[in-house]
From Swiss-Prot:
GO MF terms held by the record: catalytic activity; mRNA 3'-UTR binding
GO biological process: 3'-UTR-mediated mRNA stabilization; mitochondrial mRNA 3'-end processing; negative regulation of mitotic cell cycle
Gene from which this protein is expressed: Angel2
UniProt record similarity statement: Belongs to the CCR4/nocturin family.
Any matching Pfam family: ANGEL2_N
Organism the protein comes from: Mus musculus (Mouse)
InterPro entries the record matches: ANGEL2_N, CCR4/nocturin_mRNA_transcr, Endo/exonu/phosph_ase_sf, Endo/exonuclease/phosphatase
Name used for this protein in its record: Protein angel homolog 2
């Protein structure tokens, strides 16, 4: 990776020149190591010579303690408050890249600090306060919209019925320690002690214990920590854990953990998005799909599909993101498919690295996407400009992937009910190919699920955008809980071809926060919240 350095040339002008050193010449392996930064020396040098203008560019302010922007959850419109002049309000763009303004970037090759006294004031401040997150109850007859988080009795506000199964689901990107250290520039606003795993894990475990969700969908679960700390701790809380590590040399993966007192495990279905025989799919992201059966005092109960994923981050590779999503949806369709054409309820969680209103997000909710003429950098809504980017190819993925434009496996075997000699011939006849659009070069993607988002992504009363991640370079929404909602006299959507058995009713959700809220406690991570993501939590009702 080429880096940029600042060079002073005549009249105090600063131009960008290519440096021959990597941006991170000494990888940060321990957060206890001293940090050094030539930026502050350069800043003082320029200030003394009245050439501070050489360090300015659109979007830059002199009070900023760092001069460049990041690569992880990048958003030009989201910066810590001390990057803004007084009175400047954060503008949450309408998730369209053509609404974003261009900005010049200057990168320095070193960005670490020498000692505590060199830390910015915002970093040295201790924020002992916490922000209370409220439950938002969504039952139509509920007179009270929200209650304090400490009030755990959700059922008291909702309709009480015998033929029901209520359960809660949490989605939480817990921030892999290796990824934190490899991307330490994203956490320069943090005090170093709060970044140590020995400090973070007890906080994360405390959150999990407090919320006491029936199902956990965790992302960025580091393999070594999972085996030695995370899994044993969760098992002691009554969870059964399933884990899928990313392929290649990636240190983390996804886990789905459920209370074995509430569910039985029917199947585990990992999904590897990397396919060595397909050049497009050279990334190591994964998904994990579980089929669970509620433990209820009935002879038979409908199963529930829980899916968890962490899609590729790269804002300019929307083609890979869409293909990864299609692979996950195909596996979900395969797991939930029934002979009568119905599908069991689905809860799909994860870090989708896409913003609300983006083409990828809209595809999940609407069940269809026409990607003709769409630039690959606009798929996730993270990229500000499509200049220099190619248009998505038609089709996006090659035929040998084995997934149709309807996001199902092109050939799948329908399992027979009984294994008898007379069924041998029948089993061969039951091999059926899922119908695929006759137009093999169609630019239309579809999927057969009617999915809704647990969150509306805006604060109801003010319209201020909610965020699920907040660090030194970004404050946006990338984490979601999608579910197949119970249809109650609603218009048929793109996923109407799937007849839901029961469906899910959203009872309550744990409120999210705004960027302004989070910076009152110095962003994420902080003394009380030990990931750069907020946990998402929802309570559902399965009507039997």
């Amino acid at each position: 990776m080429e880096t940029w350095r600042c060079v002073r040339r005549g009249y105090g002008r600063c131009v960008a020149g290519r440096g021959r050193y990597s941006m991170f010449p000494y990888p940060l392996k321990s957060l206890g190591r001293d940090w050094t930064t030539p930026w502050e020396d350069l800043q003082k040098y320029c200030w003394r010579r009245h050439i501070s203008s050489c360090l300015r560019w659109p979007g830059h302010y002199s009070r900023a303690p760092y001069p460049y922007f990041s690569s992880r959850h990048f958003s030009l419109n989201c910066r810590p408050p001390f990057l803004f002049e007084s009175g400047t309000q954060f503008q949450y763009y309408n998730w369209r890249s053509d609404h974003l303004s261009n900005a010049s970037l200057i990168h320095l090759s070193r960005h670490v600090m020498t000692s505590d006294r060199d830390e910015p004031l915002s970093k040295r401040r201790k924020h002992q306060g916490t922000i209370k997150r409220n439950w938002e109850y969504l039952c139509s007859h509920n007179k009270e919209n929200t209650k304090d988080l400490e009030d755990r009795n959700v059922d008291s506000t909702c309709e009480d019925r015998e033929d029901k199964f209520d359960f809660s689901v949490m989605s939480y990107n817990i921030l892999s320690q290796d990824l934190l250290e490899d991307n330490s520039h994203l956490y320069r606003h943090c005090r170093r002690p709060v970044l140590h795993w020995s400090f973070r894990f007890p906080n994360i475990l405390k959150e999990i214990k407090h919320f006491d969700a029936d199902v956990l969908c965790l992302q960025e679960v580091q393999e070594d920590h999972y085996g030695t700390e995370i899994r044993p701790s969760l098992e002691s809380l009554g969870y059964h854990c399933e884990y899928k590590m990313k392929t290649g040399r990636k240190p983390d993966g996804c886990a789905i953990c459920f209370k074995h007192s509430r569910f039985s495990l029917l199947s585990v279905n990992p999904v590897e998005f990397c396919r060595r025989d397909i050049p497009l799919l050279d990334r190591d992201n994964i998904g994990l799909v579980l089929l669970l059966q509620p433990k209820i005092p009935r002879a038979a109960s409908p199963s529930i599909c829980i899916a968890n994923t962490h899609l590729l981050y790269n804002p300019r590779r929307g083609d890979i993101k869409l293909t990864q999503l299609a692979m996950l949806l195909a596996e979900i369709a395969n797991v939930t498919h029934r002979k009568d054409g119905s599908s069991c309820p689905i809860v799909m969680c994860g870090d989708f690295n896409s913003v609300p209103g983006s083409p990828l997000y809209s595809f999940i909710k609407e069940g269809k996407l026409n990607y003709e003429g769409l630039a690959i950098g606009k798929v996730s809504g993270q990229e500000q400009s499509s200049r220099g980017q190619r248009i998505l190819s038609i089709p996006i993925w090659p035929p040998n992937l084995g997934i149709s434009q309807n996001c199902v496996y092109e050939a799948q075997q329908v399992p027979k009910v009984e294994k008898t000699d007379s069924d041998v011939t029948q089993a061969q006849q039951e091999k059926a190919e899922v119908p695929v659009s006759a137009d093999k070069v169609s630019s239309h993607l579809q999927h057969g699920f009617s999915l809704s988002s647990v969150y509306s992504h805006y604060v109801p009363d003010t319209g201020v955008p909610e965020v699920t991640t907040c660090h030194s370079r970004s404050a946006i929404t990338v984490d979601y809980i999608f579910y197949t909602a119970k249809k109650e006299n609603t218009a048929q959507g793109p996923g109407a071809e799937v007849a839901l058995v029961g469906g899910l009713k959203l009872l309550a959700r744990l409120s999210l926060l705004t960027e302004q809220d989070l910076w009152t406690v110095n962003g994420l991570p902080n003394e009380h919240n030990s990931s750069d993501h907020l946990p998402l939590l929802a309570k559902f009702r399965l009507e039997l």
